[in-house]
Structures are given as C-alpha cells and as structure tokens.
Amino acid sequence: MPGGVREADHDLANRLAIGAGEILVELRARMFSAGADHWSVKDAGDAAAQRFLMDELTTARPDDAVLSEEGREDPRRFGGGRVWIVDPLDGTREYAQPGRVDWAVHVALWEDDHFVAAAVALPALSKVFSTDPASPMPEVKRRRPILVTSRNTAPPAAHWVANGLGCDALRLGSAGAKSMAVVGGTADIYVHDGGMFQWDTAAPAAVAMAAGLFVSRIDGSPIVYNERDPWLPDFIVCRPELSDDVLRALWG
C-alpha cells in the first residue's frame, strides 16, 4: 500500500473478491468469443482466479496461512492464527455455461475461532456482499418462505424443510449464489446436507452472520472453520425468525 499503510482486512477481502471476479468475467467472455469449450473455460478460470488471490495474499499478508480449493495444503494453518479461506471460483459448472450468473468468488479471514473479514462477489451481476459494510437484512413479507436449492437435485434436508414449512422453491447453482440469495432477501432459507468443503461456505457464512442471519450446521450447532479435515457435511443459512421452524422440520 502507498506510504506503507497496511490495508484493512475488510478492504482487502473486498478488493480480492472483486478483483478475482473481474478477471473471471473478462476471461470467460474472451474465451467463449474465441470458441473455447466449457472445460477449457472452467479450468482457465479456476487457475487465473487462484493465481490472482495467491499473488495478492502473498504480497499483502505474507505471514497469514491460506486454505483454498485450488491451492496446496498450507501447514501453517494448523498452528491457528490467521487463515484466509478462499474459493477462487465457486460454481465452476455455472461459470462454464454462457449466460449463467449464479457463480461466485469467496474470500474469508478466520482467526483462531472467529471470522475477521469476508466478502462474496457475484461477478456476473457486479455485486459484492461483505462483512464491512454488512448487508442490512431486508424486510420481507411472504405467505410462504422461499427455500433456495440446487438446480438439479435437492438434498434430503431441503425436502424435509420444504415439506415442514410449506416452502416455495428457488433453484440456483453455487453455494455462494444460494447463500447470497438469502442475504439479499430473494430467498429465506438455504439448507444443504450433501457434503461440501470449508471454502464453499466460509465467506458466505461470515457475510450472512454479519447481516444478522442464522447460520449453523443442520443440528443447530455452530460451524467451526479451519479444521484439519476441510470436509463440511452440512450447512444452514436462514432468516433468524425461521430458524426454530427449520430445525424443527429437520429434527422434530
């Protein structure tokens, strides 16, 4: 930074999510215009966004560890402290389809036992959701809550919640896009129990919690990040007034 001023963590998270997203948007348009197949576009996007994030974090936060879907294991994260949990391209399938907008970039900073900063960019929509400034939780008035699920097959937990609460459905691609639908007020509930990884939900969880939403495992327990095993079996984000009903639909 100019004059040796350290960039604030929130500002860095925002800048990285936006910057990676801009790279992805430009690369996708250029490659499709050149006639590239979807596999090539997906792989090139993953690599370009990962390279950008790692280069920037290495420069801006050389002492911090990184946990990334596309990166090598960073053993420094096992000692605790500051760990950036990133997904350079959440929703590769959607990214590799011209015109799809439901893909995201995730950047989160976890320190010891809590989030410090995070941002989720939806680059194709020119949107970014952050922990600072946090997104205000919108007021919604609906007769039936909206449950956001995967485009293809909804997991069992989603069926239980949909039946228990009489939900309408919204189908989207990536975990980031689904989570931000709840943050933005387009949906009310996102439930997933088909398994994912920490980088799939870290930034969405942080942004959702900063907005005042309810976030947990499907048993209602808090999610702990930077675990040695990056596998994360399940995830809930919903409006706080629906959390008891969601858990009741899951567990009775």
Residues covered by each model-derived region:
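An extended, acidic
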Residues: 141-252
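DPxDG-like acidic metal-binding loop motif
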Residues: 78-134
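Short loop/edge segments at beta-strand edges and connector loops
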Residues: 68-70, 132, 173, 219
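Generic detector of well-ordered alpha-helical packing
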Residues: 47, 70, 88-91, 123, ...
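Short, Asp-centered acidic motifs that coordinate Mg2+ and/or phosphate
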Residues: 65, 117, 188-189
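Short coil/turn connectors at secondary-structure junctions
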Residues: 62, 80-81, 113-115, 142-144, ...
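N-terminal subdomain of lithium-sensitive/metallo-dependent phosphomonoesterases centered on the IMPase/IPPase/PAP
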Residues: 1-89, 160, 214
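Residue-level signal for inorganic ion chemistry
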Residues: 20, 24-27, 46, 57, ...
